[in-house]
Amino acid sequence: MENVGTAASATPKRARARNRRGEGGRLREDIVAAAVALLDEAGDERAITLRSVARRVGIAAPSIYPHFPDQPAIMLAVVQREFAELRDSLRAAVEKAGADPRKRLYAVCGTYLDYAGAHPERYRTMFGGLWMPDLDGSSLTEADLAALGDETMRILVDALAACAADGQSASTDPPSDAVALWLGLHGLAHQRAVSPAFPWPEDIADRIITALAHLNA
């Protein structure tokens, strides 16, 4: 894995062509994409600095400020982007699974675990909280952080609630049970990442889902 210093000091890209009027949104997207690329390469959010991002995009660091007032704002945008990607993947999985509530719940959980396995650095950053600054010293607000993951959790809650309504789950409190299920999935995703040599049972995910979602036999 490339170390943080190497990623941050990588050869800068050629100077970026100046945006035409009305294309400022494209630069914002490029800044976020550059930050994600740095995270993927270094495996450490500390590689994402104003200078390293500017170098990757091919702009001067001050050009970032009209779009992001500080580094935490860039990190927030990265995490928001990844949650949106996860949300879209979960929605697609639900649609593909068909009408059966149990299949939909398994599709949501399986897609969640697949995302965590395919993007370990991004996943860790989304849920690790290591990048979150002291709110008094950054442009972020408590509301910014509290909203992260709301839509993805709602998909899980709805999937479990549908199982309960269909008589396939004994859950009497789908929102709370969905939180417990998420904790189980998150724990599995984390442990798979840090203990890849452990002999995980092939059906461990199914066991977690069945138990924590209170699915009927």
Predicted ranges, named:
Residues D30, E41-A73, A77:
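Helix-turn-helix
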Residues Y115, D158, A162, L181-P199, ...:
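Amphipathic C-terminal alpha-helical segment
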Residues R91-E121, A178-L181:
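Hydrophobic alpha-helical connector segments
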Residues M1-R26, A37:
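N-terminal intrinsically disordered/low-complexity leader segments
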Residues A118-S139, H190, V194, F198:
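Amphipathic alpha-helical segments used for helix-helix packing
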Residues R91, P133-D166, P175-V179, D206-A213:
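Amphipathic alpha-helical packing segments from all-alpha helical-bundle domains
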Residues R81-L105, G137-D150:
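Amphipathic alpha-helical linker/stalk segments
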Residues L27-V36, V53, V78-L86, L90, ...:
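Generic hydrophobic, amphipathic alpha-helix propensity
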